[in-house]
Amino acid sequence: MSRVCHKLEDFMRQRRIAREIALQVLYSLEVVEMEAGEAIELYWAHYEAPMDARPFSSLLIEGAWKHRDQIDSLIGGCSANWSIARMSKVDKSILRMAVFELCFCEDIPPKVTMNEAIDLGKVYGSENSGSFINGILDALYAKIHKKNDEQEIAPPPERSE
């Protein structure tokens, strides 16, 4: 296997670890009232985490928590039969993290974000979490792209000579 492939595998592994850490911290923020930064510092103080995973974990945690009202509104708009309050804390945490990635992390392909979230749901959620998360993220992704497709592109200004 080439060096490039190994680096890519390492990068993907670090991203997965970062998402798992973010899930744990976001879940804890659902249970214990504190600031995201404080929760992150507590995690680093009590659990081992690769240094390479920390910046991305922190980005996901702080971003998802800071924008949670906006994110929850987006999730709620794609889950007709489930209010955000009825969702499990694990599913809600995974969805918040994934929606943050979809909306704010343009360098991450949406399908990667969605697949990672579905995998986390299968591992850490209930037996139906993977398909539940998939359904909501698919609907949200379709809404985002439909909205982008409907935006008119302004014609270039006419040149004056």
From Swiss-Prot:
Keywords of the record: RNA-binding, Transcription, Transcription antitermination, Transcription regulation
Matching Gene3D superfamilies: NusB-like
A biological-process GO annotation: DNA-templated transcription termination
Pfam families documented for this protein: NusB
Domain of life from the UniProt record: Bacteria
GO molecular function: RNA binding
SUPFAM superfamilies assigned to the protein according to its UniProt record, in alphabetical order: NusB-like
Entry's Gene Ontology cellular component terms: cytosol
Role played: Involved in transcription antitermination. Required for transcription of ribosomal RNA (rRNA) genes. Binds specifically to the boxA antiterminator sequence of the ribosomal RNA (rrn) operons.
Membership in a protein family: Belongs to the NusB family.
Name this polypeptide is given: Transcription antitermination protein NusB
Organism (species): Syntrophus aciditrophicus (strain SB)
Lineage: Bacteria, Pseudomonadati, Thermodesulfobacteriota, Syntrophia, Syntrophales
